[in-house]
Swiss-Prot record:
Region (Disordered): 236-259
Protein name: Kinetochore protein Nuf2-B
One Gene Ontology term, aspect cellular component: Ndc80 complex
Subcellular location(s) per record: Nucleus; Chromosome, Centromere, Kinetochore
Organism classification: Eukaryota, Metazoa, Chordata, Craniata, Vertebrata
Basic and acidic residues: compositionally biased ranges: 248-259
Any one biological process term the GO annotation gives: kinetochore organization
Subunit: Component of the NDC80 complex, which is composed of ndc80, cdca1, spbc24 and spbc25. The NDC80 complex interacts with mis12 and zwint.
Coiled coil stretches, renumbered: 143-462
Gene, per the UniProt record: nuf2-b
UniProt GO MF annotations: protein-containing complex binding
Length: 462
């Protein structure tokens, strides 16, 4: 007792635990601290051990009252009153080593002591707590395995749906493949032709505009020079008028010459203004051509926008493919985890199979003993009737649990039907979405054909 692997619990805690988890009905109500410590009652201790063994080893109450036939007793019916205690001693010798108690003696059941009883019950209490926690861990493990299987199924389903979407997005219908190829080649050719014509006309217009600007600058320079010469000549004329007295004939001839020069200057000015108007008309014509070129540019921009949409669709397809690859990786990892879980479950199943084989063997031996004992134990029929009443109560509880199970199955079936209806509605909505998408693609193809025809008409006019 000095080298314990579990704590010694007080009697009050042990009483509360066994009331809540082991004993039921009047047994739990009548069970108190004085039954265990300081002077334990053998009847209550034996009854408590019997209930613990029933829960741990799944023993029936009637099995404790059967005398084993392998004992060398001349009159086994004489020791039937000692049969429950003998079975308790045999099963306690199996149970207590699992509870880390290796010094069990029959006197612990026949003549229990206070501290010794607390020691044994503390070991059993520790084992039962460990058993319940491990059972919860195992149930969580089973639920996690089921959820992992559900995730694998969902990922496989999403993988399949993503593959179908990728096939629908990447594949062009066979009746539209030739038209799609022809339209793409025509669009490419039109882009090249329009870009070449635009570059050539743009270069030509830029050269003409630069040439006209140079001519305008030169004409303006000459006009300014002539204006400057006229102003200087007027100033000189005024200055000379004040200094020289000219004859009327000279003045007349000089004025005539000046009128001629003014007339020539007016003619030159008129010619320059006419040339300016002509150049202005040419520039306006160039601006008109520029508007047409801008229209072509807008059409090119629309084509680029369509190509950008096509590129985005390809990017979306690539993104879906990446998601599909990630889902495949997750599926592989989950399949590996599934394989590991299956291997662990197989090992546990093998262990359970071995235990089942042992239990079957023991059951066969027990059945054989039971057949031999039935002839001897007819006088304990009255005790069995009481036990049968309790068994009937247990069967009634089992029937109630079965009915609850059927109700749960009905609710799950209803939920399954609702899920099936949701899936059908989702499929119908998806088909409508695909139909609308197909109609939109047909409308875009019609618009593209109309734009190509309009471009061809404009090109043929030019």
């Amino acid at each position: 007792m000095d080298k314990l692997t579990f704590p010694i619990f007080p009697a009050a805690d042990l009483v509360n635990f066994f009331r809540q988890n082991i004993l039921t009905g009047t047994e739990a109500k009548n069970f108190n601290k004085n039954d265990l410590y300081p002077n334990p009652k053998p009847e209550m201790v034996q009854k408590l051990y019997m209930r613990i063994l029933q829960q741990v080893f799944s023993y029936g109450v009637e099995q404790f009252y059967m005398v084993p036939m392998d004992l060398d007793i001349q009159y086994p019916h004489l020791v039937e009153g000692f049969a429950p205690v003998a079975n308790i001693l045999k099963l306690m010798a199996r149970l207590l080593p699992m509870c880390r108690v290796y010094d069990f003696h029959p006197s612990d059941v026949l003549n229990p002591k206070g501290k010794r009883t607390l020691h044994l019950l503390s070991g059993i209490f520790n084992f039962l707590q460990f058993r319940t926690t491990q059972r919860e861990v195992y149930m969580e493990y089973c639920s996690g395995y089921k959820s992992a299987l559900e995730n694998v199924r969902q990922l496989q389903k999403t993988n399949h749906e993503a593959e179908i979407k990728i096939e629908k997005l990447t594949t062009v219908p066979p009746e539209q493949q030739a038209e799609f190829k022809a339209l793409s080649s025509e669009i490419h050719d039109l882009q090249q032709i329009i870009s070449q014509e635009y570059r050539a006309k743009d270069v030509m217009f830029q050269e003409k505009i630069a040439q006209r600007k140079a001519e305008f600058a030169e004409k303006n320079k000459r006009l300014n020079e002539q204006k400057l010469t006229i102003a200087t000549m007027k100033e000189e004329q005024e200055r000379m008028k004040s200094q020289i007295v000219e004859s009327p004939e000279q003045r007349k001839s000089k004025t005539e010459r000046m009128k001629e020069t003014v007339h020539r200057l007016k003619q030159a000015r008129q010619e320059t203004s006419d040339k300016c108007d002509h150049y202005r008309d040419r520039v306006a014509l160039a601006f008109m051509w520029q508007s047409d070129v801008q229209g072509y540019l807008k059409k090119l921009q629309n084509i680029d926008a369509n190509l950008e949409i096509h590129r985005k669709i390809h990017e979306e397809i690539r993104h879906i493919e990446e998601q599909l690859m990630n889902l495949n990786l997750e599926l592989k990892s989950l399949s590996n985890e599934d394989a590991q879980l299956k291997r662990i479950i197989l090992v546990k199943k093998e262990k359970l199979a071995k235990v089942d084989i042992k239990n079957k063997k023991k059951q066969e031996d027990f059945n054989q003993q039971k057949q031999e004992i039935l002839e001897v134990c007819s006088h304990i029929q009255e005790k069995r009737q009481v036990i049968h009443g309790r068994v009937a109560q247990v069967l009634q509880e089992i029937q109630q649990t079965i009915s609850k199970k059927e109700q749960l199955l009905e609710t799950t079936e209803a939920g399954k039907n609702k899920c099936q209806e949701v899936i059908t509605d989702f499929r119908a909505a998806l088909e409508k979405y695909h139909d609308s998408l197909q109609k939109a693609s047909e409308r875009s193809a019609d618009r593209r054909r109309e734009k190509i025809a309009e471009l061809n008409r404009r090109l043929s006019r030019q």
